């Protein structure tokens, strides 16, 4: 019964929409017929005569005031429309007309079957948009104490936003904690420390966690049998406490490396112990997963310390060993650290081998992958590339491959070329990036600009070809060429990730809609006419009459501004300027 009633209501609604769409002319004539029949009871003739009498008694000042008021209201609407467009990227009037008025006027098709058939496609597109707007951990992130804090001490600016640091706190809680931490006092303290917002409170908690292990060893060793002293001495210190101190308290990379080496000793012992017990239950399995994340993080940061201190070959070896030992942990994106270190060594063959493994269609792309591939292609032809010669003879096969690789990279992240070509100033990269966004472009260019400068002619080739990408994708938000359409959410997320003193790069550039430009011009022109008419009523009347005469005369082809002003002078009978009189001294 309920289904029948619902079907009847839907059918009635569709009939009403159909009648409104196609029979509005009939309704209009019916209204006119009713008005004609009721003209005597409604006293339409008397009302019309009263209205005409009222209009005849109006003075020109009323029309000037009316025009000025309408211009003021239009200007306010224009200002509101411009503000709404700057904030939300769309026209308010257009959005209201499309979202609310169009359904009322029958502009929405009632095709529930099509909607149900396309539900799978919509879910796929939604899933893609979610993955495109996902915030990723920056694999090349800097050290807070040794790099970010030193920048703050020198410039007085905060390079990290609260949103970025909050995401890092969530990552630390995910990687470095587990459900069994409350059983160990040091881990319980560190579990609270990762949630602490104040940096000094986090550092104090890390020191407290290390002191608890010291006190426990001093108190328990004399009280137990000698057979268990060996086990107590093997109890590791808190590895995560050393990680926090290395990240936030160490003021130099060398100090951070020392603390990470101490963390490695503690973390390696915990990892080996939990590896033996991981099959004893879900609790031990979660603990082993946590210890694995801690160990991988420590080794990766040690490799980054070696890279910062100039020991690049040692860093490459550590990264390769880490990728062989833990091949399934792709969340840290260690291959991007490896690519940057290999480029520093100018080991381009090894870089190509890494790209062959990770530049796969089934794997997520990044600016590092796409632009490194473009750099290798450009390196083969950039030293001999000349725009003038290419325009005369055309592009060779190698040059075409390099240009296509650059177009592919620019389509993935269009913000990078401005930083590589130094058209925009660089800032310290954030701890998290958004794929295809301005934050990823900053993180890539911050470390790879030197590699592009080292390849002769690479930046020249990029400068000559990167803008050609936009001709291939005229509507990047709707359809891409090699990748999915450019996500709309990048600007909003980048503004949260990047500091306020940085001007976020926006792609594509938001152009003002024609409605706003037309309204602005119309309001300005109307306001100017109203002001001139109020100040010079006679002159403007003659000017309007002269314009009408010119437009409707046979001399329309030969009119010019001089003829207009001659007509105005004739109508006003402006006397000639008086001659200067000379009086005798």
From Swiss-Prot:
Q: Which UniProt keywords apply?
A: Glycoprotein, Membrane, Phosphoprotein, Transmembrane, Transmembrane helix
Modified-residue entries (Phosphoserine), positions: 386
Annotated compartments: Membrane
Would you tell me the Gene Ontology cellular component terms?
membrane
Q: Where are the transmembrane segments?
A: 15-35, 62-82, 512-532
Q: How does it sit in the membrane?
A: Multi-pass membrane protein
Glycosylated residues, per the record, are 47
Please state the span of the N-terminal signal peptide per the UniProt entry: none
Pfam families, A to Z: ST7 (PF04184)
Glycoprotein listed as a keyword? yes
Q: Which family does it belong to?
A: Belongs to the ST7 family.
The protein in question is named Suppressor of tumorigenicity 7 protein
């Amino acid at each position: 019964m309920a289904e029948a009633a619902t079907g009847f209501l839907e059918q009635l609604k569709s009939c009403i929409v159909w009648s409104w769409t196609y029979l509005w002319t009939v309704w209009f004539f019916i209204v006119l017929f009713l008005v004609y029949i009721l003209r005597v009871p409604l006293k339409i003739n008397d009302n019309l005569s009263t209205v005409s009498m009222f209009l005849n008694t109006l003075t020109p000042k009323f029309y000037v005031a009316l025009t000025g008021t309408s211009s003021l209201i239009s200007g306010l609407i224009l200002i509101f429309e411009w503000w709404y467009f700057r904030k939300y990227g769309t026209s308010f009037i257009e959005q209201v007309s499309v979202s609310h008025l169009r359904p009322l006027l029958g502009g929405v098709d009632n095709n529930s079957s099509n909607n149900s058939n396309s539900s799978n496609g919509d879910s796929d597109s939604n899933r893609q948009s979610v993955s495109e707007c996902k915030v990723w951990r920056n694999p090349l992130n800097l050290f807070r104490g040794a790099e970010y804090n030193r920048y703050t001490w020198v410039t007085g600016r905060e390079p990290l936003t609260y949103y970025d640091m909050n995401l890092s706190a969530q990552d630390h809680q995910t990687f470095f904690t587990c459900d069994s931490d409350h059983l160990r006092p040091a881990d319980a303290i560190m579990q609270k420390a990762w949630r602490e917002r104040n940096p000094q409170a986090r550092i104090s908690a890390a020191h407290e966690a290390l002191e608890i292990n010291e006190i426990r060893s001093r108190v328990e060793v004399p009280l137990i049998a000698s057979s268990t002293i060996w086990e107590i001495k093997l109890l590791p210190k808190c590895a995560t406490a050393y990680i926090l101190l290395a990240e936030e308290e160490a003021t130099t990379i060398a100090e951070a490396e020392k603390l990470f080496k101490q963390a490695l000793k503690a973390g390696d012992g915990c990892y080996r112990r939990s590896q033996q017990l991981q099959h004893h239950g879900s609790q031990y399995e979660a603990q082993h997963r946590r210890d694995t994340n801690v160990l991988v993080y420590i080794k990766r940061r040690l490799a980054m310390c070696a890279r910062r201190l100039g020991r690049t070959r040692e860093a490459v070896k550590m990264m390769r060993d880490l990728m062989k030992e833990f091949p399934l942990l792709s969340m840290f994106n260690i291959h991007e650290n490896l690519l940057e270190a290999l480029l520093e060594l100018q080991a381009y063959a090894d870089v190509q081998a890494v790209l062959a493994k990770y530049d796969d269609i089934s794997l997520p792309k990044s600016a590092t992958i796409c632009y490194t591939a473009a750099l290798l292609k450009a390196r083969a032809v950039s030293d001999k590339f000349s725009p003038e010669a290419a325009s005369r003879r055309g592009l060779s096969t190698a040059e075409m491959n390099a240009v296509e690789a650059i177009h592919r990279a620019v389509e993935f992240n269009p913000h990078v070329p401005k930083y590589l070509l130094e058209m925009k100033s660089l800032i310290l990269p954030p701890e998290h990036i958004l794929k295809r966004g301005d934050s990823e472009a900053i993180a890539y260019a911050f470390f790879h600009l030197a590699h592009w400068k080292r390849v002769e002619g690479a930046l020249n080739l990029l400068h000559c070809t990167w803008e050609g990408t936009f001709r291939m994708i005229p509507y990047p938000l709707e359809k891409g060429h090699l990748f999915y359409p450019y996500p709309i959410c990048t600007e909003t997320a980048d503004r949260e990730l990047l500091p306020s003193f940085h001007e976020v790069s926006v792609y594509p550039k938001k152009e003002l809609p024609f409605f706003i430009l037309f309204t602005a011009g119309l309001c300005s022109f109307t306001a100017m006419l109203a002001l001139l008419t109020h100040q010079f009523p006679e002159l403007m009347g003659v000017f309007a009459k002269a314009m009408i005469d010119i437009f409707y005369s046979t001399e329309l082809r030969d009119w010019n501004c001089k003829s207009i002003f001659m007509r105005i002078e004739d109508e006003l009978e402006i006397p000639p300027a008086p001659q200067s009189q000379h009086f005798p001294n």
